[in-house]
């Protein structure tokens, strides 16, 4: 229960490899054996299980008819929501070396937007899986395999005809959907999706420094090294503020207009790994999978 934290039901499904996705009456998880498991959202009963022959490291996207999954090997799959049947698939080209992790697909209208470990954005027809267009978030620039890691492990953000993307050792890149091409980029390195708030793009980089850009002019607004090397979590928007967690179990509240910290609270002795915003409350998960419900 989101208000009390009381457990409404439990279901034993084995060791999981991905986070939880929920929507349209179902909950979907993946286990370490490559099984995708669909559960009834009301009572937790197992609706179906299908083996995808590949590890799934990120939550899938759920539509009224489809479940879109990306495997750790770079394969994109569409499953029938009612029975788990594989309806179409697409396999991306993987680089020789990748970071362990994966982005989730995003369904917007009749299209699927997904970023890959080769540093590219792909756009597909939801019904057929037909590739509509793709583009590079960044290109390799180094001489070694480590320098050439350009994985995009962050979900694309689709807003007002623009797709906002990031990757590791690459760029913050904006794509125009109508033009089907990149229209702007700034060198950056991030594991997280950019946050759009109050006319700004806020980015948590891989070393936990923060950067901000105006959405209209794309000029840099402010930068902050206050949290450098504090292993920040993903940023969220809540009550008009930007929130992040860190490796010491703190939640920090930041003014998105100037980057100034206006509050913080220690909620755990473990690193905060994920925070999620939901109406009146926001939720944080620490490294030991403790769940916290908080408000400002």
PLM regions: where:
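Extracytoplasmic beta-rich repeat domains
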Residues: 7-24, 46-63, 86-109, 133-160, ...
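Structural signature of WD-repeat beta-propellers
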Residues: 24, 31-32, 71-72, 116-117, ...
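WD40 beta-propeller blade core
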Residues: 37, 77, 122, 173, ...
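Pro/Ala/Gly-rich low-complexity, hydrophilic intrinsically disordered segments
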Residues: 116, 127-128, 136-137, 155, ...
């Amino acid at each position: 229960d989101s208000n009390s934290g009381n457990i409404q039901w439990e279901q034993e499904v084995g060791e999981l490899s991905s986070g939880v996705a929920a929507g349209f009456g179902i909950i979907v998880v993946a286990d370490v054996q490559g099984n995708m498991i669909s559960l009834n959202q009301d009572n937790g009963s197992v609706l179906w299980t299908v083996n995808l022959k590949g590890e799934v490291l990120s939550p899938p996207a759920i539509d009224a008819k489809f479940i879109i999954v990306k495997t750790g090997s770079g394969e994109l799959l569409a499953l029938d929501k009612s029975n788990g049947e594989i309806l179409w698939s697409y396999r991306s080209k993987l680089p020789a070396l990748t970071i362990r992790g994966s982005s989730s697909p995003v369904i917007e209208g009749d299209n699927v937007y997904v970023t890959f470990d080769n540093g590219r954005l792909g756009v597909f027809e939801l019904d057929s899986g037909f590739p509509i267009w793709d583009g590079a978030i960044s290109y390799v620039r180094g001489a070694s395999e480590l320098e050439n890691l350009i994985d995009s492990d962050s979900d694309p953000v689709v807003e007002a005809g623009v797709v906002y993307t990031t990757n590791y050792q690459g760029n913050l890149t904006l794509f125009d959907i109508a033009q089907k091409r990149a229209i702007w980029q700034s060198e950056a390195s991030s594991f997280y999706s950019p946050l759009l708030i109050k006319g700004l793009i806020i980015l948590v980089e891989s070393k936990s420094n923060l950067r901000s850009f105006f959405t209209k002019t794309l000029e840099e607004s402010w930068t902050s090294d206050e949290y450098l090397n504090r292993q920040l979590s993903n940023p969220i928007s809540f009550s008009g503020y930007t929130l992040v967690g860190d490796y010491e179990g703190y939640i920090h509240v930041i003014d998105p207009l100037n980057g100034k910290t206006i509050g913080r609270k220690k909620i755990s002795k473990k690193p905060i790994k994920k925070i999620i915003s939901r109406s009146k409350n926001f939720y944080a998960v620490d490294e030991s999978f403790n769940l916290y419900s908080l408000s400002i």
